[in-house]
Each structure stands twice: as structure tokens, then as C-alpha cells.
């Protein structure tokens, strides 16, 4: 376990830092999947708003 000791003798624990990496550009398949998820979400929200307007 990694820790440091300060002047008063107290121990400070530090979390293990994850490895940092740069994100890769999206593949065409990932772009299509993201577009479908966004479209489905918009349809869901539009449908719920339409139901709310219809009920009120």
C-alpha cells in the first residue's frame, strides 16, 4: 500500500491511479450505434411528452 507520513506522524493513503490513455476515434459501427441510441431516446421522450399532453 502506498502512503506518506506528514510532520505530525499521520499517514496519508493515496488511491491507486488508473492508467491514462487517449480515446480512439469512433469506428463507423460505433457511430451508427450512437445515432440509433440518440434517435431512440428522442422518440421515447417525444412519445412521453405526447402522452402527457394528451392526458392533460
Curated annotation (Swiss-Prot):
Xref: InterPro entries: Psb34-like (IPR048028)
Principal localisation: membrane
Keyword Zinc among record annotations: no
GO BP term, example: photosynthesis
Localization, UniProt: Cellular thylakoid membrane
Coiled coil: none
Protein name: Photosystem II assembly protein Psb34
High-level lineage: Bacteria, Bacillati, Cyanobacteriota, Cyanophyceae, Acaryochloridales
Gene: psb34
Amino acid at each position: 500500500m502506498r502512503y506518506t507520513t506528514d510532520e505530525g506522524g499521520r499517514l496519508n493513503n493515496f488511491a491507486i491511479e488508473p492508467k491514462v490513455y487517449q480515446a480512439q476515434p469512433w469506428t463507423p459501427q460505433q457511430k451508427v450505434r450512437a445515432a440509433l441510441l440518440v434517435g431512440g431516446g428522442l422518440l421515447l421522450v417525444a412519445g412521453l411528452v405526447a402522452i402527457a399532453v394528451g392526458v392533460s
